[in-house]
A protein has these predicted regions:
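Hydrophobic ligand-binding cavity/cleft-lining segments
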Residues: 1-55, 184, 188-189
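Charge-dense, helix-prone N-terminal extensions
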Residues: 3-4, 10-11, 63, 80, ...
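Structural motif
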Residues: 21, 88-90, 111-113
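Short beta-edge strand/loop motif at the mouth of beta-sheet-based domains
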Residues: 26-27, 33, 37, 44-82, ...
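Hydrophobic pocket/interface hotspot
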Residues: 38, 48, 65-67, 85, ...
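Short, highly charged C-terminal tails/helix-capping segments
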Residues: 147-189
C-alpha cells in the first residue's frame, strides 16, 4: 500500500510492495526546502557526504555513480555501491541501478513552501534483509532532512541507536506480517 500522509522531514515509516519478483521499499517525505536545494543534496558529492555517503557522480544518463558509506560494521568494513544512472530529469528525477541496494529512485515534486521526496529502493524478492534495508534508508532520509537544515552527520560517531530503534520497529512489523495473512503479496512489510 503506498504511503499517503505527509510527514515533515523525518519519522515517516517506509513501506514495502512485493510484485514481479521484486521488493519495492518506498518512503515519502515532505521537506520544507525548494526542489533545487533537495536536488543539490541528492546529486552533489559535497552535499551527499553530509547525509548518505562519499560520492562520485557523472550526472548524465548512463553516467557512473560510486557511493562509499562512511559508517562501518564491527569489522570496520564500509559498503561501496557502483551504479549506472538509468533515469535523469533534473531537477525532478534521478534513478540509478547498483550492485548493492538495488535500484534507487529519487522523485521530487513541488509542494507548498517545499517539496515532496519520494524515495524507493527496488530489490530482488529473495532479499531477506528488508528490516535492515528499511532501517538504513529511514535513518539516511532523517539525515537528509537534518543536512538540509545545516546539520551534517558526524560519521565516526553516527547515532547507531536511532538506526537500532528503526530496525527493531521494522523487524517487529515484518514478524507480525509473516504471522498474519501469508496470501497477500502486497503490504507494508
Amino acid at each position: 500500500m503506498p504511503f499517503h500522509s505527509r510527514t515533515i522531514g523525518s519519522s515517516a515509516d517506509g513501506t514495502v510492495e512485493t510484485h514481479d519478483g521484486s521488493h519495492v521499499l518506498r518512503f515519502e517525505r515532505y521537506l520544507p526546502h525548494s526542489i533545487e536545494q533537495v536536488w543539490a543534496a541528492i546529486t552533489e558529492p559535497e552535499q551527499l557526504v553530509s547525509w548518505l555517503a562519499e560520492a562520485e557522480i557523472d550526472l548524465s544518463l548512463g553516467g557512473h555513480v560510486r557511493l562509499r558509506w562512511l559508517n562501518a560494521d564491527e569489522q570496520g568494513n564500509r559498503a561501496v555501491m557502483n551504479a549506472t544512472i538509468t533515469q535523469l530529469e533534473p531537477p525532478r528525477l534521478l534513478e540509478y541501478a547498483g550492485d548493492i541496494h538495488g535500484t534507487l529512485r529519487f522523485e521530487l515534486r513541488e509542494e507548498a513552501s517545499g517539496c515532496i521526496l519520494t524515495f524507493s529502493s527496488t530489490l530482488p524478492a529473495s532479499n531477506a534483509g528488508l528490516p535492515l534495508q528499511l532501517a538504513g534508508w529511514h535513518t539516511h532520509l532523517d539525515f537528509l532532512a537534518e543536512a538540509l537544515n545545516g546539520q551534517a552527520v558526524d560519521w565516526p560517531h553516527w547515532p547507531i541507536d536511532r538506526w537500532t530503534r528503526h530496525y527493531e520497529r521494522y523487524a517487529q512489523k515484518r514478524r507480525a506480517k509473516q504471522e498474519g495473512d501469508h496470501s497477500s503479496q502486497k503490504g507494508n512489510l
